[in-house]
């Protein structure tokens, strides 16, 4: 996903007018909103799959069963968990379809009234967006299986191949004049290919035979065990969405599509930079779960220092390059849209660094199957929405309001709380 965004963005900015870029950013935000209907089950499933392959025999509501390093895998528990995942995501896909066809289409029709571009292309892209979101959610657990099993390298290879296909198709179709349809259609094809490959990697002949021979634990019991923390994660993600993504949806009602486009592409590149900064952390997630099951505090300290140090280094290096070279690079490709001014960009970088530092610390807590941060996350999200309305409507702060609202909401508590909790837990300070 990181590489695809970096490679494709210049072509989008070069060939598409600002209004179309604004619609594309709205699409990206709607996709992020749809994924909230996962309710936190994907990271919870991934973490519990890691526990199962570490040898646990039961899944607990809070905490984790400690094991030795050579405990056998309980395939009966794994089989029941797989069945629970399939049932859950099947129902979620049906719900997403209903919401997008009704409320989603009504919202998009309202936005199109301000759009002077090709509305037929935009509506076709919207139909494809509905299809990709439903299919993506229906097969969402495939990523959890690979990450939980520890197939980090294979998962990355599949993503690289899928995104290479996505970029190649999208660029060709954009230059063939297909507009938004090119991007969304290419995403759909890429997602199907990635899911097929993920299935083949996890469900080997050996895995199929072991699962076939195993009894199955009741999926309802498994869902009851993991649902409390999954819902807490889901509420945390909902708060995170309100903090990080609601500005696009709310801002589009108060600002022009051109302003939304400038803010949106800046946010897109910020997301790319943040994902690069979090690569080490994402790669070590299965190891964090294993350290928790084995109560290995020394290992957790080592991973925390490595992940935090790499994240800060990438943010600083990438941020400096972006500030000095960002708009120059856009001029080089004759982009019709530019990044926000330097002062705004620097503030966004600082806010983004604090955000991902506390999110990473929360991940270390979550590896122990504890979710103490869901209420603060919801409170931060609600505060962000209130501040957005205040800054955009009565105060009319424009894009500055989009930037400052989430930063102020997070700085009040979450930015400092969770790093301090992890440091105290691991070092006793």
Predicted regions located by residue number:
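Membrane-interface junctions at transmembrane-helix termini in multi-pass inner-membrane proteins
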Residues: 133-159, 181, 346-377
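Helix-loop junctions and terminal segments of transmembrane helices
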Residues: 39-73, 270-294, 367
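Interhelical loop/hinge segments that connect adjacent transmembrane helices in multipass membrane
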Residues: 180, 184-187, 196-244, 295-298, ...
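Interfacial transmembrane-helix starts/ends
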Residues: 25, 61-91, 223, 227, ...
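Transmembrane helix-bundle signature of multi-pass secondary active exporters and lipid flippases
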Residues: 27-39, 236, 240, 244, ...
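Signature of the first transmembrane helix
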Residues: 1-55, 231-258
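Short membrane-interface helical motifs at transmembrane helix boundaries
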Residues: 98-117, 317-336
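Membrane-interface helix-loop junctions in multi-pass transport and translocation proteins
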Residues: 13-20, 153, 164-196, 326, ...
